[in-house]
Amino acid sequence: MASTEVDSRLGRVVIPALDKVIKNASWRKHSKLAHECKSVIERLRSPENSSPVADSESGSSIPGPLHDGGAAEYSLAESEIILSPLINASSTGVLKIVDPAVDCIQKLIAHGYVRGEADPTGGPEALLLSKLIETICKCHELDDEGLELLVLKTLLTAVTSISLRIHGDSLLQIVRTCYGIYLGSRNVVNQATAKASLVQMSVIVFRRMEADSSTVPIQPIVVAELMEPMDKSESDPSTTQSVQGFITKIMQDIDGVFNSANAKGTFGGHDGAFETSLPGTANPTDLLDSTDKDMLDAKYWEISMYKSALEGRKGELADGEVEKDDDSEVQIGNKLRRDAFLVFRALCKLSMKTPPKEDPELMRGKIVALELLKILLENAGAVFRTSDRFLGAIKQYLCLSLLKNSASNLMIIFQLSCSILLSLVSRFRAGLKAEIGVFFPMIVLRVLENVAQPDFQQKMIVLRFLDKLCVDSQILVDIFINYDCDVNSSNIFERMVNGLLKTAQGVPPGTVTTLLPPQEAAMKLEAMKCLVAVLRSMGDWVNKQLRLPDPYSAKMLEIVDRNLEEGSHPVENGKGDGGHGGFERSDSQSELSSGNSDALAIEQRRAYKLELQEGISIFNQKPKKGIEFLIKANKVGDSPEEIAAFLKDASGLNKTLIGDYLGEREDLSLKVMHAYVDSFEFQGMEFDEAIRAFLRGFRLPGEAQKIDRIMEKFAERFCKCNPKDFSSADTAYVLAYSVILLNTDAHNPMVKSKMTADGFIRNNRGIDDGKDLPEEYLRALYERISRNEIKMKDDGLGPQQKQPTNSSRLLGLDTILNIVVPRRGDDMNMETSDDLIRHMQERFKEKARKSESVYYAASDVIILRFMVEVCWAPMLAAFSVPLDQSDDAVITTLCLEGFHHAIHVTSVMSLKTHRDAFVTSLAKFTSLHSPADIKQKNIEAIKAIVKLAEEEGNYLQDAWEHILTCVSRFEHLHLLGEGAPPDATFFAFPQTESGNSPLAKPNSVPAIKERAPGKLQYAASAMIRGSYDGSGVAGKASNTVTSEQMNNLISNLNLLEQVGDMSRIFTRSQRLNSEAIIDFVKALCKVSMDELRSPSDPRVFSLTKIVEIAHYNMNRIRLVWSSIWHVLSDFFVTIGCSDNLSIAIFAMDSLRQLSMKFLEREELANYNFQNEFMKPFVVVMRKSGAVEIRELIIRCVSQMVLSRVDNVKSGWKSMFMIFTTAAHDAHKNIVFLSFEMVEKIIRDYFPHITETETTTFTDCVNCLVAFTNCKFEKDISLQAIAFLQYCARKLAEGYVGSSLRRNPPLSPQGGKIGKQDSGKFLESDEHLYSWFPLLAGLSELSFDPRAEIRKVALKVLFDTLRNHGDHFSLALWERVFESVLFRIFDYVRQDVDPSEDDSTDQRGYNGEVDQESWLYETCSLALQLVVDLFVNFYKTVNPLLKKVLMLFVSLIKRPHQSLAGAGIAALVRLMRDVGHQFSNEQWLEVVSCIKEAADATSPDFSYVTSEDLMEDVSNEDETNDNSNDALRRRNRQLHAVVTDAKSKASIQIFVIQAVTDIYDMYRMSLTANHMLMLFDAMHGIGSNAHKINADLLLRSKLQELGSSLESQEAPLLRLENESFQTCMTFLDNLISDQPVGYNEAEIESHLISLCREVLEFYINISCSKEQSSRWAVPSGSGKKKELTARAPLVVAAIQTLGNMGESLFKKNLPELFPLIATLISCEHGSGEVQVALSDMLQTSMGPVLLRSCC
């Protein structure tokens, strides 16, 4: 025994209570009790008497439930001794005795002195405690209010206690007792306390079950939240406070109450309900003996579910895959789960009861049971939600309870049913997919879809239910993916939205309704709230899935148009331990099964269902076409068996049309009907059961022949399945008809005189092959038919099916719903039946078998697209119509909120069409297009537009245009309200075409022409009513303005003040993300364009806002800003080129402001943002036809330079492009103004140009080059050339670009350029980009028509090259020569044609005089300069010799004497200056070029003797038609040929002279090989000339055609003589000089051949006897002259032969002697030949001959 100190603790509790018991006990009746009490008192007061009983005493060693508050415990015997008087006192039934005993027990439990487990099935200790609890429970039967509270207190303390554990029957007994007190107590406080105690106990039981621990901390419930609205109205606050104190006090008395967080807990007929037997612990068939119909239903449901579970597990058990957990766990394993299961089942059974209406107590019991279930479900934990046992309990018991209560006419019952369903959907939907698919339509949709005659209270409850359902954003999405995308489920989401729409629209006109107007209005408002909630839920879900930031965040959404990596996760129906499933708030998920449902799978499922629905819809109109459609769409197979199976199983098919189709006589229909009937198995079925089963799926057609075919096949099938029932199928056929007639007669209310059994028997006599069927058989058949009507599944249509069929119900479970909810009017007497329960069970089994029973927890946002497709049109109608028709503030607010959520969802999902539909509708409701009609609701719509812009700006995309259009219109009206003049007054001054600009300053804008007199002057322009046009800022005018409308407008303008400042839309644009700001800018530009293009009222509001938003967003990252400016750039270009001068000026001034702001930002090197920013100036400068605009641009750019020059970097490029464009302008002022600025830039800011990249310097040079072509003032051109020279000097000094600076840049001597190799300019891109534009620009000026400009340009060009060329590398020189110097001669090398006197040059040089001037002055000078430059830098550029020579050759080749002469002169000049430095290879190049020039300039007279000319002449002789024209044309051609030939002949003479000069200068430097090449060139010239001279036909033609040759002299005789003479000289000198490479034999051979050739030419002419009869001049005279001309050459040849050595002469004498002999006999034109011949004979030939004779 424990110490005395400790004993006193127990004694302080027990002894006072026992004293009271003794005091209040009757000594007669309770003497034994008193004696026990005294004994215990003495035992507790006397320590020596309270020592443990001897070990020999029974039970002394067994611990008991009592302990002393410390470590020591009382034995079981001692515990029994102490507790026995308390138990006995509590059982006396005397209030005064019972009260202290119960109070003592409560204190013992509260203080933890009682420990152990109370369970009647346990050991001695458990039995003792069980008896103690049982005794307390029975005390409430005394019917005392105070004792009731004490009992409740004790029981709640017992359940709450951690030391005392209540399980099994004891727990149920406690619940039963509290339940009984709630129903039986007459005290309201006691009732409330009993209810609160039940809730607290239930919460404790389930919380412990979830934690799997009895020590889990529990918070007291909040009593006020348990009170239903009805209870709250009937109770006063003191009751609630009293009950709350009662609960809290008890909870505080238990140890560990406050260990948990301060979370606020809102956890807020009976014998059969509290049975502890579980499925499998008793024979289920024994339960069918119950006489309580409700309990019979419950047991039947339980048995059916249990059997189904066993059947479903047989296969698993056979495979050994099922763990032995659930049943055993509940029965003997986890007692906490078992307790929770028992309590839950008990509450379900209590809620199933259908008490008589005259028994309100039992109805209250039903209600409180439902309330408890509601609380438990609302606060269900993970174990409850996912355990198979509990899910099975829900399916077994709770579903039956919902089924029974769903049609109750008591609103509280219906409300609780809805609340329970809400909990199931919210938290258990993953495990109850099939059940929710049934109960949601049954409880919610049937009420929602009944629009005309609903029960108002039920409808309001359903609407509030849907509103609560939308709180969890995951629920609607899960409903859609699991039902609307499931072929075998009803379109719950679609039906819900459509039902809400119909409710929101109200009862259709002309429809009879039971609703009062206030009721209908309240219902419409609540429906609209639900629609808003649906959209809000969808928006919340997509926000959560995509983790969208707040509306003002700049974070970019990049995953809207693609699927998330997580797909939709299928969850097995009711399996698993819970999973994430892609969402957070909903706790209804179960363990995710394998496999993901991605966006494609969702889309395919949805598309499949929609197509199937379409096919069923077609079938319900035309069955044959429907079947054809379904077969073609692969929804149904084409075999009769597959079609029959579809007709039998598919939901939504019209039963009448099925019957019609089956009765058709066509081949396919007939085969389908046979397959349909053959699919039934009638074995062992009664005849009427077979007919019932057969006719359940369709309605017999009205046509007799169709019925006959169907019933004939039925009879055949029945007899085949039951061959012994009838003798033939005829019997079954006739009996089937008879049964159908009996069914109609018995159940048709129109038939007054019913058929009797005898009548039925009589009608069927002799049908069995002449024999009668047994009378008993027929009578039983009659009874069954009369008692139970044969009907189809959808007999007794509910209100919703009386409406036209639509796709939303085609695949739903409406057939079940119509059984559950019959026609209105039967609701009051409605009772569930065995038939109903059985039917529901079949449907659940069917759903469980289908693969679609897999539950999908949606996480892929693609599903929202399909949801929007379903609901956007109803939503738009639901919000638009009330907003248009009603001015109520509440309705307006709701509609606008709905618009906002709809636009959010469609925008985030990038559903452009749907988004634009909502946005345009909302914009229309602003009424800004018709301001006279503006009301308060329109003002609210404007506010909604502003809110939309602020919160959804990141996702609006193209819809920004509609919003900004509204903003524009609003601001227009707002200004009118303030009396400000419209923007049109800014654009009032007339357009000018003169070159005089009205601008005084670059930042000026047109002044207002006249002051506005007030708002009325301008209001009329805004008054013209029009329809909303989302693409413009002006409506379409339709009516004139009345005075009343004007007054309305003035008053409405004041309403606009409520909206506030619209500018925040623009100021907050910097919070838009990178893509949204671009969409925003595009839309603003479009709206601005519409404003400015308005012919009557142009405005600049949006244009000013463009400037603002560009300013606000200028600090964005460069990449984003570039995209923004790309849009703005195109906009400013378009506006800047506007025909309205004022608008264009305003645009350019706005652009100037932006540019000034942009130039405040520093730009890093190698970036191009400034240049891009200023490009609009460039484009407008080029495109604009307005002088004022171009001048404004010049002034704007000038201002930028003057004020921001330090920050200008890449912007120089655009600036110089503008000035370059201005240089070509047709207006003098523009040119002068721009050059003035360029001059200032170069003089004052040149270092700013050169410090940037190389291209800037290049642009500057190009600009100066453009000014050198100025046609207005020669001084500008000269100054520009001077600036180019300055630029060249700076470039050479290394001031242009850091990378161009040479090392060292300056030499110590006066800054002269150093000449080190390191100072060479390389052929880098930078050097090319720098030097080439400058040099090329100067070279281009060589073609300027002004001689002075040409000279100065060439001088500057060559001075620059001469002064700085020593720093050029060879490669750079090569590029300079090719691209700069040679380009000077490109034109003349190609296009100069001396034969065309009136040719027009492509560069603008008109007439031959200008061409000749250029040739004689500029070309010659340029060639000299080129030669001089080459000579000066020969050491560097000598590898370019060949290219220079080719330049000369190309000039020589041109058929122009002056040009060729210049080329030849340059060649000679080059040879004279640097020839002495040439190597053999270089001389070879020179000689080769000379030979090429000689060959290319050969005269050609072949055309004169060609066949074409001869044909032309003969044709002229034959006809005189057009002879004059032909003659002129021929003469022109001949003149051109002859002129060309003469020109080439002259050029060849120049070539011979040049060769002679070069030979004379470098005779001793040339090798034999060089000389022979020159010889070949000269000999070729001579040979060609002789050939022409010897062509007598040619000479005669030239004479005959009137050639300019007036004599018979050979046309090219001089050329021939000079060329042969030169050849002779070369050969003679070669023999005498004998240079390097000399070959005597070769040279002598050439010389002998040349001499012989000359002599032969002379002899041929001198001795010729042929004379042409066509010669006009006597031949003798011409011959004489020719011989005279040839004489010197012949003399030279004779002398050369004579000077040969004797041996050489003797060697060649055989060849020469005949020529010498012939020459003696010839006629000579000069005595010189004879003299030379005589000398040769005397000095050379004579001695040779004499010696040979000797």
From Swiss-Prot:
- Per the record, where are the segments of Basic and acidic residues compositional bias? 565-588
Q: What is this protein called?
A: Brefeldin A-inhibited guanine nucleotide-exchange protein 3
Family annotation (Pfam families): BIG2_C, DCB, Mon2_C, Sec7, Sec7-like_HDS, Sec7-like_HUS
Q: What topology in the membrane does the UniProt record assign?
A: Peripheral membrane protein
Task: Pull one GO CC term from this UniProt entry.
Answer: trans-Golgi network membrane
Listed GO MF terms: guanyl-nucleotide exchange factor activity
Q: Which compartment or compartments is the protein found in?
A: Cytoplasm, Cytosol; Membrane
The UniProt entry, under InterPro entries, shows: ARM-type_fold (IPR016024), DCB_dom (IPR032629), Mon2/Sec7/BIG1-like_HDS (IPR015403), Mon2/Sec7/BIG1-like_HUS (IPR032691), Mon2_C (IPR032817), Sec7/BIG1-like_C (IPR046455), Sec7_C_sf (IPR023394), Sec7_dom (IPR000904)
The protein's organism comes out as Arabidopsis thaliana
